[in-house]
Design a protein with these regions (language model features):
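Charged, low-complexity intrinsically disordered regions
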Residues: 1-205
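ASCE P-loop NTPase motor core, strongest for the SF2 helicase catalytic module
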Residues: 209-216
Length: 216
């Protein structure tokens, strides 16, 4: 149909053929959302199906619209970010404490579980804070570090007339716990920077694919 072909020609650059839906879409609709994923799906479609200029144009438009990939050095990593696989946290914690540590993520509770079968001097002494009522070892402090909280520590300053402890906030204990938690959190960023370029690239690609792939 000549008139249809002429119209498509006239609208070149303003409409694109989407082989996934089998029809033309206006530019604002086609080049929107997760363009990286859309481009990959069209590429996969093209590998399996005969295609021509219109599919190639659509793919190029999506690829050109994709946001510039963020580099490893530009990323601001924080321990406990949910997009980072727990295997990476397990590897860091095992390195930090010099023993096998496993970190798991409980999605329903939005919390982390930390397991360690052998607690050594690093966990029981170096990364440990002894409060008046409770001792927080390295594993307990790692759990706080992962969710960016500090233990709410109290101490007794004597007894009331009924013989119960008069409890006040243990500011010193909290400060010490905070310092150790900061050490754990900052250590993660340093540890990442010491990993291989391949490791860093995989992590950066993961970030870009998850967050840096949208056109609004």
């Amino acid at each position: 149909d000549n008139s249809r072909d002429e119209l498509i020609d006239e609208l070149k650059g303003r409409i694109f053929y989407n082989p996934l839906s089998g029809g033309y879409e206006i530019k604002d609709r086609f080049i929107a959302g997760n363009v990286v994923d859309k481009a990959e799906r069209i590429e996969a479609w093209m590998a399996e199906n005969p295609h021509g200029e219109r599919e190639r144009e659509a793919l190029t438009a999506l690829q050109e619209a994709a946001p510039r990939p963020i580099t490893f050095d530009e990323l601001d990593f924080n321990l406990g970010e949910r997009w980072i696989p727990t295997g990476i946290y397990s590897a860091y914690a095992s390195y930090l404490f010099d023993t096998n540590v496993r970190v798991g993520y409980l999605e329903s509770m939005d919390d982390y579980a930390v397991k360690c079968s052998v607690r050594n001097a690093k966990i029981l002494d170096q990364f440990c804070v002894r409060g008046y009522y409770r001792t927080y070892d390295g594993i307990a402090l790692l759990k706080h570090a992962l969710v960016n909280t500090v233990p709410d520590m109290t101490k007794s300053i004597g007894k009331d007339e009924n013989g119960h402890d008069i409890k006040v906030r243990d500011s010193e204990g909290i400060q010490l716990a905070n310092a150790k938690i900061d050490e754990i959190r900052n250590g993660f960023v340093e540890w990442l920077s010491e990993q291989s370029p391949e490791f860093q690239k995989r992590l950066t690609d993961m970030y870009n694919r998850k967050f840096n792939c949208f056109v609004r």
